[in-house]
């Protein structure tokens, strides 16, 4: 039986998960929920099912794989990654996985806070000011490695791709000073399964966020 991935009909927190499902050639189907328009942003499609799915912590996204019912986007990523040995092998690799997993989520959340804020126009210049340093840290962490953990791809490369791509959309020039990050993105998008997915009708590059967001909601 295919796994079921449940999420809003947006890119959001499901982007890295969808990419990983495709890369691993996993059998899955999507349950997409639609949020209503302003001013109410009706969530009844999701709320009507929220407590009926047997989830311990009902939330979106969720993944149901037989008796396994998982929420929290990084827990979902790790679950898929463990099936395919994509969590790092040595202690050093696992440390790098853990660091980047959390760093990518922090940075992604920082951008989301700005994009969802009613004060978006005030917050954007300050965020852009700190962006070069943020990208520099990613660049230094990657170094000359082909993937963020080393020679082999791991699930955190999917998270890193997502967060770097989000920032590239937010500020198209933000990676210009970091050729290794641009190479990483090209390398990732050039993977056979990823490239095929991005050309398919299943691919959902936008909207980046829900309709509640000030930026990235279309």
Swiss-Prot record:
It is found in: Cytoplasm. It comes from the Eukaryota. Its main location: cytoplasm. InterPro entries: Glutathione-S-Trfase_C-like, Glutathione-S-Trfase_C_sf, Glutathione_S-Trfase, Glutathione_S-Trfase_N, GST_C, GST_mu, GST_superfamily, Thioredoxin-like_sf. The modification Phosphothreonine is found at residue 34. Residues 2-88 form the GST N-terminal domain. Its EC number is 2.5.1.18. This is Glutathione S-transferase Mu 1. It comes from Macaca fascicularis (Crab-eating macaque).
């Amino acid at each position: 039986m295919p796994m079921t991935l449940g999420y809003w009909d947006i890119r959001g927190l499901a982007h890295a998960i969808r990419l990983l499902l495709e890369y691993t050639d996993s059998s899955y189907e999507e349950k997409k929920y639609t949020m209503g328009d302003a001013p109410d942003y009706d969530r009844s499609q999701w709320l009507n099912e929220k407590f009926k799915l047997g989830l311990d912590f009902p939330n979106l996204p969720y993944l149901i794989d037989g008796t396994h019912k998982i929420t929290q986007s990084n827990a979902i990523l790790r679950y898929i990654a463990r099936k395919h040995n994509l969590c790092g092998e040595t202690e050093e690799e696992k440390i790098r996985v853990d660091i980047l997993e959390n760093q990518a989520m922090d940075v992604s959340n920082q951008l989301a806070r700005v994009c969802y804020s009613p004060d978006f126009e005030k917050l954007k210049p300050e965020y852009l000011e700190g962006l070069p340093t943020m990208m520099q840290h990613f660049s230094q962490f990657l170094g000359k490695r082909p993937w963020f953990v080393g020679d082999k791809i791991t699930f955190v490369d999917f998270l890193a791709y997502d967060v770097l791509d989000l920032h590239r959309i937010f500020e198209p020039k933000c990676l210009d000073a970091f050729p290794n990050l641009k190479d990483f993105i090209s390398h990732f998008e050039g993977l056979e399964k990823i490239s095929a997915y991005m050309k398919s009708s299943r691919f959902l590059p936008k909207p980046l966020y829900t309709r509640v967001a000030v930026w990235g909601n279309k």
